[in-house]
């Protein structure tokens, strides 16, 4: 059976996009057929029907309404699909002009992928949506990444060994690599981080073609003005641009010139450390419970994106950190100005994403209004920052908001206060802005009154008070008088204006050139008004895009001001302090607190967070605190809080402490917590060892290392040996600043042998057989871990706790007697010695001793009487 012309067209288009679902536009619906329909119906939970036959089989079909397509697109993208959007390129009427059986022209206008989204409904407003390309050329490798929704474009050289931590830092939505060996090598990493991986042909990564592509995009003859790039960097950037040309069908987004980064500009933080410290995502994968969720007080999407970027990439440039802290000082010290700025920023829309949609021709009147409203707020923000003593960072940000008076005046005059979403709906141009549009609207909305006004005009002109303007389907609009006025109307000078149309038994009908023109205008007024508005939309959009570079700078200015004021508001509310950051190797924190735990305790209405000091300030070599103490005492919290304080300080924020002196940190490593990796065949202990190996092989003398209970996942002596050797390696080889928490109390002896190791412990107090956690860190070593008491608190059966106590007593006794815990024989520990727990005896009356105690009133006794009472108690107790 031959296929229909429509289905033949569908199959032809689908053949070009075999790896994507094809949204095939048919009127008000996007239809899907064959396997696409089956997959989409299941993913979207919509009805699967059929339409016609192909090769004797029913053709599966499903569809989604055009007006609701974005929601369905979001679902499909999140489930890992790519979608090719095929639109109608002409109307059915236009198709018929080419022949009665002609099929409406259709083609794919866009390939929707996770890394190429621009619509607000498909994006997280407060997060970047990065498309990343990785390229390897001979002995060079590089990453390039772009967010087409904001125009951000970055590149950096990166060795393959550093690919994992960089992907963890960027958290891209999509990764593109050359098909072949690089794709195969990168696939496990993409699967681990759940990043959609897209292979491209090697031609997309050709550095020579890439250079030409980039020069054409930025309208330059050479890339030297943007930086000195190696061939791998050029290749990666070119691949990003080529992929955008493929997915956007030639409509390139408004990318900013590439910003070159390098590994030595930011603190190196590997993937496991980011996960363990919960910088931007908690261990559960959500935002809640992360450091970002606690510190984020930004009020604009751009400010929120900048905060996440800074938190993910703490700086190693002292000048940059100092500039950020200086700006923060200014706003912290001026709370009134801070509140004023935050109030203005709350009304500031997202310029970046509005600008990007306009550039890709996916914008609408609300994007024009977003630019207008932002520029209007920008004028007030700039005035609020007029101060000759303003720090450079704030002064530059304020300056970026200047010089938009002409554009703002244009948009103010042209747009209504709250425009509709789509340009095709019309009604967004303000009255009085365009005379032709006003006339069209008047004719469209007030046609009757226009005709009535014209009728009055003609009645006065002819002197015929009974003159009427009427309408019928044959003549359209016409002027009608009684036949008694026929001679007058058909004689000069009236006949020069009034043109005879028809004579009936009692009436004579005329028209005028003016009436004919008005009739045409009335009939076409609606369409004309819409066309004029579309034309004006394009003109206004063009005016905005002409200022795109300056608007991008303004967007960065808004984001910077928002971030500074948000951090200032946070510092005031949470009593944070300005850290001292320098190039020393100091690490001294007074009264440090864990920002996430502190806030959680407050929300739960629990105890106040116990602040603690930390001093890892080496004179020369390593500085390591060996931290011992019971479970649940707060060791892991203490470790993490100091790492977070370092991150906050080097991103340019105040910190949760009474005082902090942070010598520049180059790397941050954290081995905290326990988890297995079953998908890769790794046990908990193996994961721990892999992460520890990475630390020992990479940490330098400016690293901050956080290690928690190394060696716990294996036999006691094996674990102790590994922890011992690890501590020595950190001290002698890495020479890092480190916090090392352990339950191996034997390690505390190393403090007497290694000059850079100091013992510290988390205090506890025992009361009537129970352990009370004080959460105070002090110098010294713990003598025990209180594991049995913690087990009791956790709710282990009383018989198990009792049995554990008896075994522990036996082991400790053997150790004291010199035999060592390992010498205890199983026979020395009778089976089931503590099980089951004895039943409580029936309640009895008070003993003689208790009766005597009840009769004693200590405050009434003289010293001699007290002594005599003690002797009496002793006699009674003997019976």
Curated annotation (Swiss-Prot):
CDD domains given in the database record: ABC_MutS1
Family that this chain belongs to: Belongs to the DNA mismatch repair MutS family.
Originating species: Ruegeria sp. (strain TM1040) (Silicibacter sp.)
Gene: mutS
GO CC annotation: cytosol
Name of the featured protein: DNA mismatch repair protein MutS
InterPro entries with a match to the protein in the record: DNA_mismatch_repair_MutS, DNA_mismatch_repair_MutS-lik_N, DNA_mismatch_repair_MutS/MSH, DNA_mismatch_repair_MutS_C, DNA_mismatch_repair_MutS_clamp, DNA_mismatch_repair_MutS_core, DNA_mismatch_repair_MutS_N, DNA_mismatch_repair_MutS_sf
Keyword field contains Transcription regulation: no
Residues binding ATP: 629-636
């Amino acid at each position: 059976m031959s296929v229909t012309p429509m289905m033949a067209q569908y199959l032809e288009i689908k053949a070009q996009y075999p790896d994507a679902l094809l949204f095939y536009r048919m009127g008000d619906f996007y239809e899907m057929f064959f396997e696409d329909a089956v997959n989409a119906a299941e993913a979207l939970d919509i009805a699967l029907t059929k339409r016609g036959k192909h090769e004797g089989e029913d053709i599966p079909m499903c569809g989604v309404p055009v007006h609701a397509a974005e929601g369905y697109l979001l679902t499909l993208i999140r489930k890992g699909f790519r979608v090719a959007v095929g639109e109608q390129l002409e109307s059915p009427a236009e198709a018929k002009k080419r022949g009665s059986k002609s099929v409406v022209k259709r083609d794919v206008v866009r390939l929707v992928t996770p890394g190429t989204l621009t619509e607000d409904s498909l994006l997280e407003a407060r997060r970047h949506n990065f498309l990343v390309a990785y390229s390897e050329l001979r002995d060079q490798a590089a990453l390039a990444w772009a967010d087409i929704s904001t125009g951000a474009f970055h590149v950096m050289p990166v060795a393959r060994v550093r690919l994992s931590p960089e992907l963890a830092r960027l958290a891209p939505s999509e990764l593109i690599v050359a098909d072949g060996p690089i794709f195969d090598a990168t696939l496990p990493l993409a699967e681990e981080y759940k990043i959609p991986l897209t292979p491209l042909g090697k031609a997309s990564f050709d550095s020579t073609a890439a250079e030409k592509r980039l020069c054409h995009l930025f309208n330059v003859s050479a890339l030297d003005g943007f930086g000195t790039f190696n061939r791998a960097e050029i290749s990666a950037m070119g691949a990003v641009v080529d992929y955008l040309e493929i997915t956007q069908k030639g409509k390139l987004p408004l990318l900013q010139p590439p910003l070159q980064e390098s590994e030595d500009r930011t603190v190196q933080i590997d993937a496991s450390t980011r996960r363990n410290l919960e910088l931007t995502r908690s261990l559960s994968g959500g935002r809640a419970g992360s450091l970002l969720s606690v510190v984020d007080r930004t009020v604009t999407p751009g400010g929120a994106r900048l905060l996440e970027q800074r938190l993910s990439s703490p700086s190693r440039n002292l000048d940059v950190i100092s500039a950020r802290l200086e700006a923060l000082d200014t706003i912290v010290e001026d709370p009134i100005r801070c509140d004023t700025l935050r109030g203005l920023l709350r009304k500031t829309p997202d310029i970046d994403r509005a600008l990007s949609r306009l550039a890709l021709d996916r914008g609408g009147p609300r994007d024009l209004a977003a630019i207008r409203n932002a520029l209007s707020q920008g004028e007030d923000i700039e005035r609020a920052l007029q101060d000759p003593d303003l720090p450079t960072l704030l002064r530059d940000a304020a300056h970026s908001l200047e010089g938009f008076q002409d554009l703002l005046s244009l948009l103010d005059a042209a747009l209504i206060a709250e425009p509709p979403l789509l340009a095709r709906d019309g009604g967004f141009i303000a009255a009085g802005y365009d005379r032709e549009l006003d006339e069209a609207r008047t004719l469209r909305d007030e046609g009757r009154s226009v005709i009535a006004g014209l009728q009055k005009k003609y009645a006065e002109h002819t002197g015929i008070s009974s003159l009427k303007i009427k309408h019928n389907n044959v003549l359209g609009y016409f002027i009608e008088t009684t036949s008694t006025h026929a001679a007058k109307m058909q004689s000069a000078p009236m006949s020069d204006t009034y043109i005879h149309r028809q004579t009936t038994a009692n009436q004579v009908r005329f028209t005028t050139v003016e009436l004919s023109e008005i009739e045409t205008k009335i009939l076409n007024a609606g369409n004309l008004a819409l066309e004029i508005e579309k034309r004006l939309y394009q003109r206004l959009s063009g005016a905005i895009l002409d200022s795109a570079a300056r608007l991008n700078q303004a967007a960065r200015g808004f984001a910077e001001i928002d971030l500074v004021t948000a951090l200032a508001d946070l510092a005031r509310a949470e009593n944070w302090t300005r850290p001292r950051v320098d190039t020393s190797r100091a690490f001294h924190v007074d009264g440090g607190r864990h920002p996430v735990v502190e806030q959680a305790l407050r929300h739960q209405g629990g105890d106040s967070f116990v602040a603690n000091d930390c001093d890892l300030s080496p004179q020369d070599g390593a500085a390591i605190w060996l931290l011992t103490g019971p479970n649940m005492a707060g060791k892991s919290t203490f470790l993490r809080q100091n790492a977070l304080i370092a991150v906050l300080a080097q991103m340019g924020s105040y910190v949760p402490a009474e005082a902090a002196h942070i010598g520049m940190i180059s790397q941050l490593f954290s081995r905290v917590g326990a988890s297995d990796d079953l998908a890769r065949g790794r046990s908990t202990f193996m994961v721990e060892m892999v992460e520890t190996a990475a630390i020992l092989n990479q940490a330098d003398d400016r690293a901050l290392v956080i290690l928690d209970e190394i060696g716990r996942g294996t036999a006691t002596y094996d674990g102790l040996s590994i922890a011992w050797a690890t501590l020595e390696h950190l001290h002698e080889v890495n020479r890092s600043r480190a916090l090392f928490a352990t339950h191996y109390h034997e390690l505390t002896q190393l403090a007497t042998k290694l000059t850079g190791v100091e013992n510290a412990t988390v205090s506890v107090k025992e009361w009537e057989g129970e352990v009370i956690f004080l959460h105070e860190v002090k110098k010294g070593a713990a003598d025990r871990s209180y594991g049995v008491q913690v087990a009791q608190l956790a709710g282990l059966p009383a018989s198990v706790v009792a049995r554990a106590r008896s075994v522990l007593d036996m082991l400790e006794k053997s150790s004291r007697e010199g035999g060592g815990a390992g010498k205890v024989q199983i026979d020395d520990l009778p089976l089931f010695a503590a099980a089951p727990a004895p039943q409580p005896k029936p309640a009895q009356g008070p003993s003689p001793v208790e009766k005597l105690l009840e009769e004693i009133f200590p405050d009434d006794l003289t010293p001699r009487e007290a002594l005599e009472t003690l002797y009496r108690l002793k006699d009674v107790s003997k019976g």
